[in-house]
């Protein structure tokens, strides 16, 4: 598989908020050969990188394993022998593209929280500018999951004539109030860490706000799993004898078991703090929280009115972060805009992470849609009843009552 890993300067960049920086650099990876009309843009999720494929590469974005290697590659759903696949790290992140930890050329110091606020619109416009640099005027498809799915929707809204097909997976037109609340709590875990220092913690003698970022990531992990998957994987088991608590406890607390689920959360949070920047977590979650498809329009359908391509909306039954009902509402808006749309619902108890861990269920409809649009053999169109009831949230009440 032909793989290109590069960083491109887009020069001065004006953000959605009106602020500018002298230079925006975007790191990207590209796979396959471009033939003029086979380009597929993949939009990564919140803490993802441009390293979407190539399991054996260890020099990309400090991630040993590509985040969607089961989907992108030769003979896979997004077949790099058929398509030229581009994935770009978004502005505000910390995997090569310019963000808070990058050096401000005007001061010689990292931006920190002097970096401009970032929105999903900024991600889309930076991707459009990158594709211009690469000589790609038009896309066969844009594909992405979670907030990457919001990025996909924004492409249909802002550049409807530049893309033939869109695939928002495990996404919605906006976050609901519960998820907004949880993201706010996660950010406060970071900003109340004494090492955060108003976002300026990059000095040689500074320690990053790792405890706050670890807590934020632990909350995120719970959001991405379902009640059933957590029960199946961890239950109430105590951790093994060799497990070590990451966070200190008091003498009375030591009487009680250190559970397997706590050990899992601690381990993954510690690994996350080794590779991700706390300020980037603040910036990217705010971009996700702020996203509203209808912004500037009367409705979601109005926002999508200019898009006349094909759309495959994919959702998962146990995803309480972006529910099947929210996905159906997005599909309805696309139908109202006269787009060709199918809402493909996958029965899964993996929660929000299902789009990353179920390639056998995600791959076939995605591959068929890229090839044949909504008429693809493996593509189904489900009608999801609107309901106020939910059994998706693993901690729906307790987070607010303890």
From Swiss-Prot:
Domain of life: Archaea
EC number: 2.3.1.31
Class of the enzyme per the UniProt entry, highest EC level: transferase
Residues annotated as the enzyme's active site: 146 (nucleophile), 319, 352
Alphabetic keyword roster: Acyltransferase, Amino-acid biosynthesis, Cytoplasm, Methionine biosynthesis, Transferase
Name of one Pfam family that matches: Abhydrolase_1
A cellular-component GO term for this protein: cytoplasm
Subcellular localization: Cytoplasm
Function statement: Transfers an acetyl group from acetyl-CoA to L-homoserine, forming acetyl-L-homoserine.
Subunit record text: Homodimer.
Listed name of the protein: Homoserine O-acetyltransferase
């Amino acid at each position: 598989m032909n793989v290109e890993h590069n960083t491109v300067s887009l020069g001065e960049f004006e953000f959605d908020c009106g602020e500018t920086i002298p230079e925006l650099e975007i790191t990207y990876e590209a796979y396959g050969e471009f033939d003029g009309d086979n380009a597929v843009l993949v939009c990564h999720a919140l803490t993802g990188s441009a390293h979407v494929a190539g399991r054996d590469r260890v020099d990309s974005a400090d991630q040993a394993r590509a985040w969607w290697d089961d989907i992108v590659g030769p003979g896979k759903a997004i077949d790099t022998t058929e398509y030229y696949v581009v994935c770009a790290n978004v502005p505000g992140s910390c995997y090569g593209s310019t963000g808070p930890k990058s050096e401000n050329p005007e001061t010689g110091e990292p931006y920190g929280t002097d970096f401009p606020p970032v929105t999903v619109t900024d991600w889309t416009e930076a991707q459009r500018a990158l594709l211009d640099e690469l000589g790609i005027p038009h896309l066969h498809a844009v594909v992405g999951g979670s907030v990457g799915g919001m990025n996909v929707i924004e492409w249909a809204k802002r550049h409807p004539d530049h893309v033939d097909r869109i695939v928002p997976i495990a996404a919605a037109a906006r976050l609901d109030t519960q998820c907004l609340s949880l993201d706010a709590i996660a950010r406060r875990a970071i900003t109340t860490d004494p090492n955060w220092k108003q976002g300026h913690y990059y000095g040689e003698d500074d320690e990053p706000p790792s405890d706050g970022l670890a807590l934020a990531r632990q909350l995120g992990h719970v959001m991405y799993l379902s009640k059933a998957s957590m029960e199946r994987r961890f239950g109430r088991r105590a951790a093994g004898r060799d497990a070590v608590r990451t966070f200190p406890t008091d003498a009375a607390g030591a009487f009680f078991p250190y559970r397997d689920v706590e050990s899992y959360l601690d381990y993954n949070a510690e690994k996350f703090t080794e590779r991700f920047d706390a300020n980037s977590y603040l910036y990217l979650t705010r971009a996700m929280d702020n996203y509203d498809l209808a912004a500037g329009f009367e409705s979601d359908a109005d926002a999508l009115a200019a898009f006349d391509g094909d759309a495959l909306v994919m959702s998962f039954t146990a995803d309480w972060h972006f529910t099947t009902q929210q996905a159906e509402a997005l599909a309805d808006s696309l139908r109202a805009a006269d787009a060709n749309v199918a809402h493909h619902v996958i029965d899964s108890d993996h929660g929000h992470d299902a789009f990353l861990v179920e390639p056998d269920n995600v791959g076939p409809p995605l591959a068929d849609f890229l090839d044949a649009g909504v008429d693809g053999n493996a593509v189904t169109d489900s009608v999801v009843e609107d309901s106020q009831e939910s059994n998706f949230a693993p901690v729906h009440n307790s987070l607010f009552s303890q």
